[in-house]
Regions:
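Conserved Nudix-box catalytic region and its N-terminal flanking loop in Nudix hydrolases
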Residues: 2-3, 61-71, 76-116, 134-137, ...
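Acidic, metal-coordinating catalytic segment for phosphate/diphosphate chemistry
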Residues: 26-69
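A short coil-to-beta-strand element that immediately follows conserved catalytic motifs
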Residues: 125-133
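Short, solvent-exposed loop/turn elements at beta->coil junctions and helix N-caps
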Residues: 24-25, 54-56, 134-139
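Nudix hydrolase/Nudix homology domain
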Residues: 2-7, 11-20, 94, 143, ...
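Active-site-adjacent beta-strand/loop module that shapes the phosphate/pyrophosphate-binding cleft
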Residues: 40-43, 139-161
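N-terminal presequences and immediately downstream first alpha-helices
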Residues: 1-44
């Protein structure tokens, strides 16, 4: 596929001129470490960047974390986006997020890990695996962490989901939140006004839904 065109006013970057030189760990905790990366930029100058790294990294080409995007479908009810509410010490606040987590060695693939996280955090069982993203950056400014997004369908009328049960690990606390698909953006804004911090991926998803609906309305 041909690359997307670059507008005439934009600088063009030569990928060959940017090179990673070395990594040096300068601090290490139980789950995260801080490293100093040396790299060469387009001018040929050597620069330093501080990067947070995950201590547990996958040995394969899989991402080090996954994020499930579940849509709950039930007879005679609105389709709902399934999120989890939890307290995040780093934010000093409660957040609204997609079911997500680190890929464990026993998972094997991102899809298996995403379905396991969905089931443990929400109690729901996936009834339709839709799409898996390529490797994406979690926060490319500050960390080397990567994630894959896995979109899934949950049949709420399935017996397993009628009897859904969360499976918490030690120190884990999740509350399931179901938001009608026709009102996601407004509901997230309401949660934000109430002091919740919405994960940027969730909000970007909601914006995409809203923009898609507006563009579709203009064409009709």
């Amino acid at each position: 596929m041909a690359p997307s065109p670059t507008p005439s006013h934009s600088r063009r970057l030569d990928k060959k001129k940017f090179t990673h030189v070395s990594s040096e760990e300068i601090a290490r905790g139980e789950h995260m470490s801080l490293a100093k990366y040396k790299y060469v930029d387009a001018t040929g100058s050597q620069k330093i960047w501080e990067v947070a790294e995950r201590c547990q990294k996958p040995k394969s080409t899989e991402s080090d974390s996954v994020c499930a995007l579940p849509i709950l479908r039930r007879m005679l009810k609105y389709d709902c986006l399934v999120l989890v509410k939890q307290y995040r010490p780093s934010m000093k606040a409660f957040t609204l997020e997609f079911p997500a987590g680190v890929v464990e060695p026993q998972d094997g693939t991102s899809e298996v890990s995403a379905l396991r996280r969905l089931n443990s955090q929400t109690g729901y069982t996936c009834t339709g695996l839709k799409q898996t993203s390529p490797l994406t950056a979690s926060d490319p400014v500050h960390t080397s962490c990567t994630t894959k997004l896995v979109s899934v369908e949950v049949n709420g009328d399935d017996l397993r989901n009628l009897n859904a049960q969360q499976k918490f690990g030690e120190g884990e606390f999740y509350e399931v939140v179901q938001i009608p698909m026709n009102d996601v953006l407004q509901r997230l804004n309401d949660y934000s006004e109430d002091g919740y911090v919405v994960d940027s991926r969730v909000y970007a998803f909601a914006l995409g839904l809203s923009m898609g609906a507006q563009m579709g309305a203009r064409r009709t």
